[in-house]
Amino acid sequence: YFYLIRAYKDVPYVTIPSTDDTNEFVVPAEKFENILDSLIMDLEEVRTYAVNKYTNKKANTARFTRNGIDALLADLYLWDGDWDNCIAAVDRIVANRVEEYKEILEKEPNTTLVLFNNEYPLISNLSPGSGNLGNAYNEIFGRGNSFETLFELAFEGGSGSVENTFIRNYYADRRQSSTSIGSLKVEARVASNIGTSSNVVYKSAYDGRVYESMDKDG
């Protein structure tokens, strides 16, 4: 919805799932300001329940954490013209990163992280053990899952393939070894004769229809 209201301003705003034909499908457009306020309220409500930091480095950047929520809140507050709350959200991110930097520095004295202006921990642009530049770019955009990353779509490299296992497990055909379309988990109320224990519900990996191609024998 954040993308939609920035592109089109007022858009239909629905917060409940459509489970049958009794739902109203012709919904009038909601005002930009009302949707923005609703998004902010939802994020503020769940922020304190979000994970602060995972122990796994990849999960820490590929899953939404409190830092990720604060970053999104900062952007939302910018569009709302609420400068104080925007600054507060960014300050929380910086404070969190400073604490992480101190922890890393204790364990890895030769870390490539540096304090910019003695305040903001960032990745040094100098490659370790050499005077070559480009280390920061490679860490952020090449290797990925970097210290500076708040949230990114992580893809796993190996054996010549690049994929996102989580996305494949939930939204792709699990019969395939690589990411491809063809899987969707059915909501239990859609039909009583459709199995819900398996993620694979399409008859064919190349059939994009939903109900018609669901595996009713599951």
List where the protein language model places each region.
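Short, charge-rich amphipathic alpha-helical segments embedded
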Residues: 6, 95-102
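Elongated scaffold/linker segments in the mid-to-C-terminal portions of large proteins
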Residues: 33, 99-218
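Aromatic-anchored glycine-rich loop motif in surface-exposed flexible loops
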Residues: 1-61, 85
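Solenoid-repeat scaffolds in large eukaryotic assemblies
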Residues: 86-89, 93
